[in-house]
């Protein structure tokens, strides 16, 4: 049955596409995102281009991919019968940012833009980075997100991570994920930096609680491909029902 939603998505095919962009070109968009920062280890920047009815083209958003937030993420997705990772580091990307101009979402023909762009992004990564097999993405529960747009694109949901204590860079206003982030302050290890945060009021760090994040994955070859079936069979975590936002009283 042809639905209104399917007609809207069909219309997007003629008016929306992705185009490679430089870091400088996406920064203006990233600064408007709620995270307010440009991610590290970026591999691919794409502008979301909208061809208007008058023929002019506007950049209405950006989608950014790169290495995973946690360097060991690739080892924690799927394993073979002997417990060896089915994926190598270069075979896993993370969708690091997706930002769309608020005014673009008000255009009737772009009402399904976010989910459509994610689908375009997966196809673009498969085309431009053929070695990549899996794209992971996270929804920040601390921001009240459940990943509704990923659910709309049939992403595989692998659950929510636990709340953890993490180092926070006070000057930059961001979490510490990599050793080089503490080394620039003269610390050799994360443990040294954590001890400094606990005992030194003037430490560049403080220890905060990082709320767990909802994790989703996309298998770029499709779940019905031989590769997709192999990854599905080896998933370390069970596939779970999609989370929903609590209903307000």
Where do the protein language model's features map onto the residues?
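Short, cationic low-complexity segments
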Residues: 229-249
């Amino acid at each position: 049955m042809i639905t209104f939603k399917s007609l809207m998505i069909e219309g997007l095919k003629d008016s929306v596409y992705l185009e490679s962009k430089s870091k400088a070109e996406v920064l203006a968009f990233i600064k408007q995102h709620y995270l307010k920062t440009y991610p590290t280890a970026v591999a691919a920047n794409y502008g979301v281009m909208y061809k208007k009815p008058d023929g002019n083209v506007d950049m209405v958003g950006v989608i950014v991919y790169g290495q995973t937030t946690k360097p060991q993420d690739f080892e924690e997705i799927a394993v073979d019968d002997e417990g060896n990772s089915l994926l190598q580091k270069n075979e896993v990307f993370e969708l690091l940012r997706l930002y769309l101009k608020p005014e673009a979402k008000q255009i009737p023909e772009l009402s399904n833009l976010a989910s459509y762009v994610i689908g375009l992004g997966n196809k673009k990564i498969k085309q431009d980075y053929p070695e990549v097999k899996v794209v992971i993405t996270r929804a920040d529960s601390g921001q009240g997100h459940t990943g509704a747009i990923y659910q709309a694109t049939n992403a595989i949901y692998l659950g929510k991570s636990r709340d953890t204590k993490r180092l926070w860079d006070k000057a930059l206003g961001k979490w510490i994920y990599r050793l080089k982030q503490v080394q620039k302050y003269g610390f050799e290890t994360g443990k040294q930096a954590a001890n400094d945060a606990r005992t030194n009021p003037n430490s560049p760090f403080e220890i905060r609680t990082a709320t767990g994040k909802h994790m989703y994955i996309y298998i770029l070859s499709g779940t019905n491909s031989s590769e997709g079936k192999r990854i599905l069979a080896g998933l370390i975590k069970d596939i779970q029902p999609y989370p929903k936002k609590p209903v307000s009283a």
